[in-house]
Amino acid sequence: MINKTLHTKHTLLGLLAMAVLMIPVWSQAKVQMLDRIVAVVNDGAIMASELDERINTIALQFQEKGQQLPSPAILREQVLDRMILERLQLQLAERAGIKVDEASLNEALAGIARQNDMSLEDFAATLREDGYSWTQFREQIRQDMVISRLQQRSVASRIQITDREVDRFLSSELGKQMFQEDFRLGHILIRVPSEARPQQISQARAKAKEIIERLEAGSDFQQLAIALSDGPNALEGGDLGWRPAAQWPTLFAENAINLKKGEFSQPLRSGAGFHILKMIDRKGGAEKVVTQYHVRHVLIKADALTSAEQAQQRAIRLHDEVAAGKRQFKETAAEFSDDPGSARNGGELGWVNKGEMVPEFEQVMLNTPVGELSPVFESQFGWHFLRVDDIRDADMSTEFRRMQATQALQKRRFEEELETWVQEKRSESYVDIRL
């Protein structure tokens, strides 16, 4: 099954919305100076020109938002740190053979365009008019998707939530609040190495306490996050966005629940370091009526005897035969689908809630009209095509609450383990910064 109860989704569109790492075309027209290496990452390198291009783009974004930039040295350090983590994960993905095909990339780009109320062609034209390279934007989105798939394979696929855990969670105060409130949190992280010496821990603790003192004296949380945080959202002022209360990591949820709007926490210790949270805002939570989709699909997977390209061609052939009326969808799924859970039922997945499936599947499901066949598309599980048989609005039932609770626990566990995993991979890698 590709159901999210087995595979936690790391919100892809959240990553895509952050794909602001486009390279302005005009920056390429500058006189080319002698390039140099600013960081060695295992067997790869980050060049000064790459870093400068990224900094130029982020500086433009700050300017457009009317935000104050940190000092050039701090901005350079923050951007380079982000690029190092990206490069490490892309190297891991390449070794694991993780790729994103053109069809999946185009579907993701179309989703971004729809979010901006544009067609894909209009969206591309708008970017070009604003001086950005469409080719480089596409490549950045592809890299974001590759990293997301790597994280799914390396972290999310190991997470299993038991019925007993769900029962305990639903009966807890936090579980009850999950259906009542959403939190928007700000975050500052003072990183501590995984095998830190006592002196390093003391220095990090002292730095976190100094930040608290500055906040208490009236300093701006967003500016401190940009200048001092080691977190992945530092350049967004530490803003982690909105989530249901229970979808935050346990450490965050339990300490944020009593914060009023505008308040911040004391330093919180985790394996990654010291965290400071700010309650940017809080509001009422999930709606009681949800849209559900009755879906069937066919999955064709690559294996030891079938290459990814052969699996794709097989999926396309079966899709075209169903579309031409040469085959029935149900019989095709029963005979050929590599998803045994649904194949025996003619590919039927039953009623599916928005947010329940992996991103690539959900995106296609939401954009396929009732009764029509979707294009062939790729997810981390293989090649699919699907049909939406019906759509309905349903009251939030006990079953749906359990599904929401399972997703919340998965997302929480994923965030906790992802942070540790990224830090471990960086510790295991050779990184030489040459700023």
Swiss-Prot record:
Pfam families: Rotamase, Rotamase_3, SurA_N
GO molecular function, a single term: peptide binding
The keyword Signal is assigned to this record: yes
Residue span(s) of domain PpiC: 180-281, 290-390
Top EC category: isomerase
GO cellular component: outer membrane-bounded periplasmic space
EC nos: 5.2.1.8
PROSITE patterns with a match to the protein in the record: PPIC_PPIASE_2
Catalysed reaction equations from the record: [protein]-peptidylproline (omega=180) = [protein]-peptidylproline (omega=0)
Compartment(s): Periplasm
Key words, A-Z: Chaperone, Isomerase, Periplasm, Repeat, Rotamase, Signal
UniProt entry tagged with the keyword Translocase: no
GO BP: Gram-negative-bacterium-type cell outer membrane assembly; protein folding; protein stabilization
Signal peptide start and end residues: 1-29
Predominant place of localization: periplasm
Domain commentary: The PPIase activity resides only in the second parvulin domain. The N-terminal region and the C-terminal tail are necessary and sufficient for the chaperone activity of SurA. The PPIase activity is dispensable for SurA to function as a chaperone. The N-terminal region and the C-terminal tail are also required for porin recognition.
Function: Chaperone involved in the correct folding and assembly of outer membrane proteins. Recognizes specific patterns of aromatic residues and the orientation of their side chains, which are found more frequently in integral outer membrane proteins. May act in both early periplasmic and late outer membrane-associated steps of protein maturation.
The protein, known as: Chaperone SurA
